[in-house]
Amino acid sequence: MTKEFHHVTVLLHETIDMLDVKPEGIYVDATLGGAGHSEYLLSKLSEKGHLYAFDQDQNAIDNAQKRLAPYIEKGMVTFIKDNFRHLQARLREAGVQEIDGICYDLGVSSPQLDQRERGFSYKKDAPLDMRMNQDASLTAYEVVNHYDYHDLVRIFFKYGEDKFSKQIARKIEQAREVKPIETTTELAEIIKLVKPAKELKKKGHPAKQIFQAIRIEVNDELGAADESIQQAMDMLALDGRISVITFHSLEDRLTKQLFKEASTVEVPKGLPFIPDDLKPKMELVSRKPILPSAEELEANNRSHSAKLRVVRKIHK
């Protein structure tokens, strides 16, 4: 039985419109989720166009099959249940050598946060899980109860950027010596015990950064995004585009760096021309990230941290 995906798509029109969709093109939605981006992209394709939609969450695919039924009947959609880090291999298996555009909506989706049993949210009591792919072996429970102190500190600093990482890791160590930490609420309460009163008064939940860090570790989110975006740049046809929505500084920093490296070139001074093999492959479509409009911010609180970056392929 599938769980309904109630998901408000962020930066919907901006993300797809910036792809400059060709009606007969081949496109990829690397993060199907609630299928909002997929549905809007498909509305711009003719029946000769095609969309490949990736998601490692079976619930997302099951629900998208209902939402996108009219396009499925026309043979315009292929679903791929896999991590988008396998983008190139899975598209090659499907006989695709080049794509005209691809969009990414990074991070956890609203339905995953809202489904209590998935264990993503510090606001809802549930077993520690946080797997985007329910078939994966590593869970938040494993990280919290079996990672040693130094590994916990590493991921809390690296992926959560929490200045109380050492104290939180130590408190977790002490708590699990008494009994395993089994639920999201238990973990959130342990984190609260460490944070000083002035931190608890700040806007936002005190456990937010640590939960983010554990989720990124469980799903290797940054590693997967790095690999996938680089593969996407290789597979783009000339004039093809990549749209990437990020929701926190780590994702945005990674995307910005990948796009910068692909769109700039350093050549020795005095060269009369830039050799073809040194020319940048990509061009920034927008130098600054595109942000949600005031109307979207008012309608959807979860869009407040979203940033959209776009590049275009200019050289093979």
Curated annotation (Swiss-Prot):
It catalyses: cytidine(1402) in 16S rRNA + S-adenosyl-L-methionine = N(4)-methylcytidine(1402) in 16S rRNA + S-adenosyl-L-homocysteine + H(+). It comes from Streptococcus pneumoniae (strain ATCC BAA-255 / R6). The keyword rRNA processing applies. This is Ribosomal RNA small subunit methyltransferase H. It comes from the Bacteria. GO terms for cellular component: cytoplasm. Its EC number is 2.1.1.199. One of its GO terms (biological process) is rRNA base methylation. One of its GO terms (molecular function) is rRNA (cytosine-N4-)-methyltransferase activity.
